[in-house]
């Protein structure tokens, strides 16, 4: 084993904040609301800011400061239209990022399904890397279950369930009693107040259809 530092390329799933105009106040209020709605999920979360749709100059210093104070960690800027904009963002402390255009790669080999038989209590986090996650019990409020694949919960989901954590859009979330704080697939999420009441406390399946979350009731 080498005792020297090593520098390697890698990839991560990050949240992207898409700005529609150059109003810094609007952007900051938006991220503040998100952190207040789900502080355990968003607090200290890294975020990339996409400015491709912004017309006019942005106050990058105020943007970075405001997003940081709201609770996020601003990582960088993407979608800058010219070198001048890139320089302004860089001078404010933002990294300049671009979407990768790497060739299509074979899907990673899935790991065996992770099965948990005990209740997932508040404050606990369970992660199934490169595979599916099966919970044969309840997930309490304040608990978090994460999988790079799909999640099956044979009990009540009161906490947070995050499937497709590495970007797998075909992932699903199936639970026998939906009372979640947050449900997410491949970075798309709903908070509890965004879940239609007809699906509350029901056996359901969550999927991603045309880049939008879709819930359907399952027969018992």
Curated annotation (Swiss-Prot):
Transmembrane segments: none annotated. Pfam families: MinC_C, MinC_N. GO terms for biological process: cell morphogenesis; division septum assembly; regulation of cell division; regulation of cell septum assembly. The keyword Cell cycle applies. The keyword Nuclease does not apply. Keywords: Cell cycle, Cell division, Septation. HAMAP family: MinC (MF_00267). This is Probable septum site-determining protein MinC. Interacts with MinD and FtsZ. Belongs to the MinC family.
